[in-house]
């Protein structure tokens, strides 16, 4: 199974990176010099064959995600390349070591284990095990607690804050007429593609607001750490996400705190990896104890544990920001549900606000890399300037159909599965981001809304990764 989105895959990659040596950590092959030269062949059994030297068994290349991010050539895909520190095996290793340290009362090496659940994996696992969404969240808490987790949280508060920051960023850009079209930034597959393929041309248009995963990292490693009086470096923060590209995002150097000597997110596992863990345990999710998700942020718990944000399936950015901008820029209070018009396909839709016959707001949703490529080309030809904001997601249908969501059963089409997950999502209660908790977090921990501190911890930067033009990156659509 592919571990990263289609846009970040290198085609025809093998466990053993060949002597073309595109990777920055190549296999080192020592061989004697020959005046006559030699023929080289990588065989199917992983041997490096040279006609004069016989066969040499190659070692596997151990490449970390940070190596990939530092490389200007490719983003390596897949289980063939060993992704260290970002796997269910690493999580189990940490949990087992932590249990041993607790048993031996080695308190200096005991870590607080925090698990954060995104909404889409909860829906995927609820459908897989045929249980209600709220019960799926409770059973997941029971499962992770059985492994030794200390806290199991949802991303709700981070989702709320991401919308608050992104909508204000858009209004500021619109009023200043600066760097429009604004492009969403919560999808790491899209962001990495933008950095490596289009660089400084496209990056000024990308929203600087951190994704909910990385905002959650700040909340856990700073606010929760203060509340429970544990240093950030002693907290092991795991997120459960709908796509493998979130592993890349968590590994960015921008999200490593030198002050805390800690990453905001230490490990990312995915819906399908949780399913694999449950399968290996030979115990379905429904057989684990039911515990409400933890809510360490305030004394008042929300009525529900799993929430939707607007109608769209990837965080609700386009819909929420459109309504906010209509009200705060044009004094239009849009109380009815928004209807996006389908254009070329169901993954490219737009919505328009008109005043006095003139278009004043024009938003779009672009899912899937075919639409993203068309989007970028239009921007390059200056034909996209009439869009003010575009919600961009690498996966067709958005995060609900993330690359690491549980796959359809035999005989089931992916669209049928996606439709069922969409139904589950649309039946969730809607969160209103501007609430008492987000106000509390801004006022008590971030020095208020739109302050230097809030900008520092809730926004990020992007980097133009200069590619070697001799390297051909073949993207499969």
From Swiss-Prot:
Single GO MF descriptor: metal ion binding
Gene Ontology biological process terms from the UniProt entry: iron-sulfur cluster assembly
Gene3D superfamilies, A to Z: 3.40.50.1780, Fe-only Hydrogenase (Larger Subunit), Chain L, domain 3 (3.40.950.10)
Family indicated by similarity: Belongs to the NARF family.
InterPro entries assigned: Cytosolic_Fe-S_CAF, Fe_hydrogenase, Fe_hydrogenase_lsu_C, Fe_hydrogenase_ssu
SUPFAM superfamilies documented for this protein: Fe-only hydrogenase
Keyword RNA-binding belongs to the record: no
Signal peptide: none
Functional description taken from the UniProt entry: Component of the cytosolic iron-sulfur (Fe/S) protein assembly machinery. Required for maturation of extramitochondrial Fe/S proteins.
Protein's UniProt keywords contain Iron: yes
Residues reported in the UniProt entry to bind [4Fe-4S] cluster 1: 23, 68, 71, 74
Organism: Drosophila simulans (Fruit fly)
Entry keywords, A to Z: 4Fe-4S, Iron, Iron-sulfur, Metal-binding
TM helices/strands, residue ranges: none
Annotated protein name in UniProt: Probable cytosolic Fe-S cluster assembly factor GD17698
Binding annotation for [4Fe-4S] cluster 2: 187, 243, 395, 399
């Amino acid at each position: 199974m592919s571990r990263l989105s289609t846009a970040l895959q290198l085609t025809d990659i093998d466990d053993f990176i060949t002597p073309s040596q595109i990777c920055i950590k190549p296999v080192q092959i020592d061989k004697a010099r020959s005046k006559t030269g030699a023929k080289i062949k990588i065989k199917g059994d992983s041997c490096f064959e040279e006609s004069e030297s016989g066969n040499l068994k190659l070692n596997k290349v151990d490449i970390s995600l940070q190596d990939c991010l530092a490389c200007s050539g490719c983003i390596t895909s897949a289980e063939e390349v060993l992704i260290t520190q970002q796997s269910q095996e690493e999580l189990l290793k940490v949990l087992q070591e932590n249990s041993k340290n607790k048993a031996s009362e080695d308190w200096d090496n005991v870590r607080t284990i925090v698990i954060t659940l995104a909404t889409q994996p909860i829906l995927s696992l609820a459908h897989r095990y045929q249980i209600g969404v709220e019960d799926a969240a409770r059973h997941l808490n029971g499962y992770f607690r059985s492994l030794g987790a200390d806290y199991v949280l949802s991303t709700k508060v981070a989702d709320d804050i991401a919308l608050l920051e992104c909508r204000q960023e858009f209004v500021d850009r619109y009023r200043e007429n600066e760097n429009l079209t604004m492009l969403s930034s919560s999808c790491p597959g899209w962001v990495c593609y933008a950095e490596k393929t289009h660089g400084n041309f496209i990056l000024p248009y990308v929203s600087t607001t951190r994704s909910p995963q990385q905002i959650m990292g700040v909340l856990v490693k700073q606010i929760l750490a203060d509340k429970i009086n544990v240093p950030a470096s002693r907290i092991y923060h795991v997120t459960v996400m709908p796509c493998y590209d979130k592993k890349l995002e968590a590994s960015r150097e921008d999200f490593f705190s030198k002050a805390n000597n800690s990453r905001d997110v230490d490990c990312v596992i995915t819906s399908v990896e949780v399913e694999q863990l449950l399968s290996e345990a030979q115990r379905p999710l429904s057989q684990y104890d039911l515990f409400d998700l933890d809510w360490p942020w305030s004394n008042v718990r929300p009525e529900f544990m799993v929430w939707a944000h607007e109608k769209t399936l990837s965080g609700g950015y386009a819909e929420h920001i459109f309504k906010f901008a209509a009200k705060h820029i044009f004094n239009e209070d849009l109380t009815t549900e928004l209807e996006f018009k389908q254009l070329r396909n169901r993954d490219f839709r737009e919505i328009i606000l008109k005043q006095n016959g003139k278009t004043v707001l024009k938003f779009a949703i672009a899912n899937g890399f075919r639409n993203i490529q068309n989007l970028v080309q239009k921007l390059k030809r200056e034909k996209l300037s009439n869009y003010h904001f575009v919600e961009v997601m690498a996966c067709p249908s958005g995060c609900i159909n993330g690359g690491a969501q549980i796959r359809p059963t035999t005989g089931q089409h992916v669209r049928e599965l996606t439709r069922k997950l969409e139904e589950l999502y649309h039946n969730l209660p809607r969160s209103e981001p501007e609430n008492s908790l987000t106000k509390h977090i801004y006022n008590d921990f971030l020095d208020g809304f739109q302050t230097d501190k809030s900008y520092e911890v809730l926004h990020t930067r992007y980097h133009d990764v200069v590619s070697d033009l001799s390297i051909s990156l073949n993207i499969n659509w």
